[in-house]
Amino acid sequence: MRLPSIRRSQGRQGPSGSRVHAARRRRRRRTPAVALLAAALTVAGLAAAGPVALPASAAPAGAAAPAGATATAGDVTGFTRSGNTFTVTASGGAKARVVVARADIFRLWLSPDGSFTDDPAGTDLAPTTDFGPVATSWSDAGAYYRITTGSLSIRVNKRPLQFSVFRADDTTPVWQETRPTSWTGGRTTQYLARGADEQFYGTGLRLGEWALRGKTVPIAVDNKWRENDNASPAPFYMSTNGYGVMRNTWAPGSYGFDAPTTLTHDEKRFDAWYFTGDSLKSVLDAYTDVSGKPFMAPMWGFELGNADCFNASNPDYQGDHNRLRHQTTPDVVGYAADARAADMPSGWFLPNDGYGCGYTAPLKATVDALKAKGFQTGLWTSTGLGSIADEVGTAGSRGVKTDVAWIGSGYKYAFDGVRQAVDGIEKNSDARRFVWTVDGWAGTQRNAVVWTGDTYGTWDDMRWHVPAITGAGLSGLNYAAGDIDGIFGGSPQTYTRDLQWKAFTPAFMTMSGWGATGPSAGYHDKQPWRFAEPYLSINRKYLQLKMRLMPYLYTMSRVAHESGVPSTRAMVLEYPDDPVARGNLTSGQFMAGDSLLVAPVVSDSPVRDGIYLPAGTWTDYWTGRAYAGPGWLNGYQAPLDTLPLFVKGGAVVPMWPQMNHTGEKPVSTLTYDIHPRGTSSFSLYEDDGRTRAYRTGAYARQRVDVTAPAAGTGTVTVSVGAPTGDYTGKPASRGHEFTLHVATAPATVTLDGTPVPGLASKAAYDSAASGWYFDPADRSGVLWIKTPGTAGAFTVAATGTSVPAAAALPSSAPIDRSAWSLVHADSQETAAENGAAARAFDGNPATLWHTAWSSAKPAPLPHEIQIDLGARYAVDGLGYLPRQDGGVNGRIGGYEVYVSDTTADWGPPVASGTFADTAAAKTAALAPKSGRYLRLKALTEAGGRGPWTSAAEITLTGRPAS
C-alpha cells in the first residue's frame, strides 16, 4: 500500500497540548514563488505582502505613506544616548535604536511608529545579550553621527537616515546602506552595497549550494525538500566582509545577494542583531554567543539511527498491516539482534515512525531489550508529547523526532514544539537533549538536529545533499542530516555511497518502509545490515570507521559547542583566504573537523574528478600517497568501497578501539593516528557521553603536541599531556598507541628518553605490552608505537625517520561556469519538456539540453553547441554528463571539441573520440589550447537510436589565459 508521500501523522497534540488538524500533507508540484509567499504569510497569520518596494524617491521622505506605498524614516531630527542605547528620531515619526551589547555585537531596531513595542521574537532568538559593560562613545561628524566601540565605528547618516558600519579605523567598510530602509505595506527592506568580491553564506539548512552571491534565497518554510528549497531556513547570513546579521523576527522573508543586496521580511519593522569579526569563524562565535551555542549531543546520537514502524498491527497504522517482523513494537528487538549478528555498528531506533503507528505497551520492556543490545530508543511525535514524562522517566526513551502537526506551519510554532520536546527529555531524566526536526529557525542549533525532509535515493539528491548539509554549518547548525539514501526509492549503490560520506557527519539516520524498491524483497528496509554483499561489508567498513573516529568527531562537536564552528565544515571556513574555497567550486566536498577532507562520490562512476586540495600536504587515507596543494586532483580511482578521503599534514586524530556501540568495551588503549609535518597539536575532549554533568565541569581534556620535519628526515616528537579534569567513568589510566605516517623506519624510538624495543613483525607487536614496528607496505609507511598504561604526561620520540614526499598537483582546475553564456545551438527542444541548450551548463544534472524532438521531422545529426566562457582560458579537459533522468536518447557517441578566440574560425578540433553508451560521466583530455569559446560537436548518437543529442552537464578544466 502506498502511503502519503510525506511521512506525517494524523491529528495530534500541538505543543500546548491542544489537538490540531489532521496533517497528511502530500508531496506537491512546485508552486510559483508568489503563491508560496502568499501561503507562507497565510500560515504565519500575517497580512498579504504588498507590491515590490519602489525607489525611495517615489514618496517624499518622512511623509505618511498611503497603504501599499513605499515609505522611509526621513531625515534625522534627534539623537540621544542612554547608557549603551542610542536613539535616533526621524522626521516622519520613526525612531531607530542602536544597542551596543559588546564591542563586536550590536542591535539595530527601526520602529516606523517610534514605539518599540512590537518585539514578537522576544528572547527566543537572542537569549543572551548582556555581556557586561561596553566602552562606547559618540560624536557629531557633521553629515553623520558616529558611535564607536573598541571594534567598530557605526555611522548614522542624517539626510536621509541611513546606517553604515566600519572597522575601528573608521575607514574599512563592513557594510553600508545604499538607500534608506523602506517599508511597503507589510514588508520592510534594507539595501546594502555589495563588494566587488564579497561572498555570502548562511540562511539555514538550504538544499543546495552554500555560496550565495548572485542568488535570491527565500527565508521561509516551504516543506518541499527539493534542490534550492528550505528544510530549516534561518534569518541569518554572514559575509566575507567580516560581519553576520540575524533578523530578530518570525516573519518570512527573502534575501537577494545581488548589487545592491536586498534584505526583506514580511513585517512593518526592522530588528536585527549584527556580529562582526576578523574571520567567518569569529562571526559564527559571536552569532552563537547571542542565539545559543550548538547543543552537545549524547555519544549514542553520533551513531547510526534507524526509523521505521514496528507496530503494523495497530488498526490506526496507515501502512501495510502485514509487514513481516513489524507486527508489534517488540519486533524491533529482532532487528537489533540482526545488526549485532552482522557485526554492524548502530546506536538507536525510532520504532514508531509511521502514520498511526504508535507503540505496544509496555514500552519499557522494548526499551530495556534494545538497551541490552546497545541501542537507545527514541520516539516519533505521532502521538504528541502528552506521555513524554512517562516515556522518558519510566520507560527510558531518550530521543524525540518532531514532525508535521507538532511543528505545524513552522516558525515560532515549530520552535516551541522542539523546546517542549527538549524539556520532556531533560526534565524527566539526567539525559541530554536529542531531538530531530524540520522547519528549524535561527536558534534551533541549541536544541535540535535538523534534517532535509523527505528526499529520494538518487544520485542527483545525493549531489545537492553534500552542499546542503555542509552549508547548514555556516548558520551554526552543527547537527544537520538527511535520511541515508532518502526515504523514497534508492538502490544498494546509492545507499552505500550516501552512507560513506554521511558517516563523517555528526548525526545520521535511515528511514525504512517507504521506498518504491528496496534491498530486502519488497519490505523496503534501509538498515545497512539488510543488504547483500558487497554492500554489506562496505557499509560495515564505514560504520566501523566512524566508531573508531568517535573521540575525534566528538571533540569537534565540543569545539562547535564552545565556538559555533561546525564539525562539518565548508572549505571556506578552514581556508577563508583561498579564492577557490570561497565559492561553490568546492561545494561538493567538505572538511570533517579540521583534519579530514571528504570528497563524496555522487555519481555512478568509479572515478572522482574535481577534488580540490588547498595549500599544504594532503595524504590519501587509504594509500598513504601524499599530495602538495593547492591544486586539483582529477581521475581519482574510487571504486564502490572507496570514499575519497584525505588527511591534512600535521593531523593528530584520536581513535577508539573497534566497537559497535558506545560503551561496548572500555577504552583501555587510545590510539593517536598522526600525520607528522611541522608543528601541530590536538586537544582531546572527553566526558561521560550521556548526561548533562558536563555543564557543571564534569569533563576532561588531554593535549597532544607533535613536532616533525616539514620535509625530509629528522625526529618526530609526540608529547602527551596528563589528562586534566574529571568525570564519571574516566579511566584511572590507559595505554596509548601511535600510528605515525612516515616514509622510513626510525633509527630509535624512545619513551621519556628510554629506548622502546623494536619488534620484528606486526604479530609480535600486537602481542607485546609495548614496543614499535615499522611496516613500509601499510599505506606507504606506518610506524606503530605502543606505550604502557599511565595517568601522567609522557613523550615519545622517533629519530632518523622521514616524512613522505608530496607529489605536485596539476595546475589546471575546473573552470567557473558562472560567467558562461550560450552562443549557438543548432537545435534545442523548446516546445515540449526540458531541452533548452543553456541547461547543459546550469549546474543542475537533473535538467538537460535536448535537440528538438517534438516536431514531425527532427533535425539530423551532427549537432553542436557553442558556449562563451566569459574570459580566455587555457582549456585542457572536457567533462560530459549524459542525461540523468533515466532516459537514453541523445547520448553523445562520436564527438569533436573545438576551442577558439572567435566563433568565425574554429580551426581543427582539439579532441575527438567516441563516448560509451552509458549514463556515467565522461571526460576527454584536450590538447591544451587557449580561447574564449567552446564548440562541442556531436557526430553520432551513442546507441544509434535516433538523430538526437542531449547533455545534462558540460564542464571544462584549465586555467586563466592572458
Language model regions located:
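Secretory targeting and sorting signals
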Residues: 3, 26-63
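A low-complexity, Ser/Thr/Gly/Pro-enriched, surface-exposed linker/loop concept
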Residues: 65-79, 83, 99-143, 184-187
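Short, well-ordered beta-strand segments enriched in hydrophobic/aromatic residues
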Residues: 88, 98, 108, 145-154, ...
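Catalytic and substrate-binding clefts that recognize carbohydrates or anionic sugar/phosphate headgroups
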Residues: 90, 129, 135-309, 318-322, ...
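Substrate-binding cleft of carbohydrate-active enzyme catalytic domains
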Residues: 264, 272-440
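Catalytic core of carbohydrate-active enzymes
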Residues: 423-424, 444-449, 468, 474-482, ...
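Predominantly extracellular/luminal regions of secreted and cell-surface proteins
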Residues: 551, 661-684, 806-846
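Aromatic, loop-rich ligand-recognition surfaces of beta-strand-rich domains
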Residues: 806-809, 835, 842-909, 915-962
